[in-house]
Each structure stands twice: as structure tokens, then as C-alpha cells.
Design a protein with these regions (language model features):
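Short, charged interaction patches at domain edges and termini
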Residues: 182-208
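A short beta-strand-loop-beta hairpin characteristic of the jelly-roll/cupin
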Residues: 114-118, 125, 133-152, 193
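A short hydrophobic beta-strand segment most commonly corresponding to one strand
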Residues: 130-132, 173-189
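Non-heme Fe(II)/2-oxoglutarate
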Residues: 2-98, 111, 199-216
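Short beta-strand His + acidic residue motifs that chelate non-heme Fe in jelly-roll/DSBH
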Residues: 118-119, 164-172
Length: 216
């Protein structure tokens, strides 16, 4: 679908809840170079991808996916066997989480035309989302207000994952990889931000205060 169709569907199906407002913050150069290199190498070589026949209930496009952590799994089985969780800890350890709900990797294959996927929410209840990008391509993530967050290597998007958003597939590279985290909590840990001389916020829409420990 095009952007106007996307915004129309979001307005009709996902009206804004004053008690659960959308927000987004984008950080570039989020990981240190050696951490990003380790993660990128793992995702591009030995990572055990699976396939899903559809993106969500309303979008039948197939894509590659792998759950790495799921709180709904049985006790002591939340982390998926056969996946090395260590490369992902570099991301999760820098986020002010109270509890993680899900951690998964997505891969969208090349599309012949630019097309926005059907909008969705990750969970029905209020929670936070973090989306980490590994590739430079023409496949943005679209927020509920229609703003497209471009896919750039080592970029982190923090957003309200219980409000409408959508992915898209690239036309200028073979695939687009992202790491999607759903959690209860707040923003980037303050001690990590202090390690960065000038943390680069490239896009921001926050109609309230989001803290490290999850307060608003």
C-alpha cells in the first residue's frame, strides 16, 4: 500500500488513545563498532532463520523470522535453544528494561516495488518497543503519524509498540534485517548515554517524559 492508504487505515483502525500516546526516538551509532560488527557477522552467517507465511493477521507477505526470547515460553526455556544470545545483550543491556517480553529477528526480502506493509500493533497492552537496524536500504519503518524511520546500520528506534506501525521491504538490496524487542520499562540507560559524547538523536516525537526506569 502507499502512504496515504496506510495513514487512512491507521486512522480508521487504530485511533489515538490519550492514555497511550505514540512516541518515537531514533539513535544513530548506538553500539560500539566492534559490537555492531560481531552482531552483523552473526546475523549474516550462522544465524538459524525460520520462515513465516505471513507478517500479521492482515498481511500475507512471507518473511524470515526467529524468536530469540519469549516470556510466554515455559520457565527456563524463554531463550531459544540454538541461538547465541550474547550478541544481542549489547543492545538489551543498554535499555532501561523492567522486564523483556520478546526478542526476535526479522528479515524482509527484496521487493520489486516499494510497498508499505499492513499496519499492526505488537501487543494489545501498553509496552515499549526497540527496533535495531542492521542494513542501509530504502525500507523504512512507518510510525502511526506516517513518519518513515529510514533503515540505517547501527540505528536504534525506541517507540510505543502498542500503537500502530508498519515495516516495508527493500528494493535496492537483497534483504533488510532488524532486531525487534518488546519490553516493559523506559528509555536508554543514563549511564550508557553518559558514555557517549554526543548521543545522536536523529528523529524525535515524545509528547511526554520517558525515563530510564519506565516512568512517564
Amino acid at each position: 500500500m502507499n502512504l496515504e492508504e496506510y495513514k487512512k487505515i491507521v486512522k480508521e483502525r487504530y485511533p489515538i488513545d490519550p492514555k497511550n500516546l505514540p512516541y518515537y526516538i531514533v539513535y544513530d551509532d548506538f553500539l560500539f563498532p566492534h559490537e555492531f560488527g560481531t552482531l552483523k557477522s552473526y546475523m549474516s552467517s550462522e544465524f538459524p532463520w525460520g520462515i513465516s507465511n505471513k507478517l500479521n493477521y492482515d498481511d500475507q507477505n512471507p518473511y524470515l523470522v526467529k524468536k530469540i526470547y519469549d516470556v510466554e515460553n515455559r520457565a527456563r526455556e524463554e531463550w531459544t535453544a540454538g541461538v547465541d544470545e550474547m550478541p544481542f545483550i549489547a543492545i538489551t543491556s543498554r535499555i532501561g528494561m523492567v522486564a523483556m517480553l520478546r526478542l526476535k529477528a526479522n528479515m524482509y526480502l527484496n521487493s520489486q516495488v516499494q510497498d508499505i506493509h499492513y499496519p499492526h500493533i505488537d501487543y494489545q497492552f501498553p509496552h515499549q518497543g526497540a527496533l535495531f537496524y542492521l542494513d542501509d536500504c530504502d525500507a523504512p519503518t512507518y510510525m502511526s503519524d506516517g513518519v518513515g524511520i529510514e533503515s540505517k546500520p547501527n540505528r536504534l528506534l525506541l517507540f510505543n509498540a502498542s500503537t500502530a506501525h508498519s515495516s516495508s521491504a527493500p528494493t535496492n538490496i537483497n534483504y533488510r534485517q532488524t532486531i525487534n524487542i518488546n519490553y516493559f520499562g523506559g528509555g536508554i540507560r543514563s549511564e550508557y548515554l553518559r558514555m557517549l559524547k554526543d548521543p545522536t538523536v536523529v528523529s524525535e516525537h515524545v509528547p511526554f517524559t520517558i525515563t530510564t526506569h519506565g516512568g512517564r
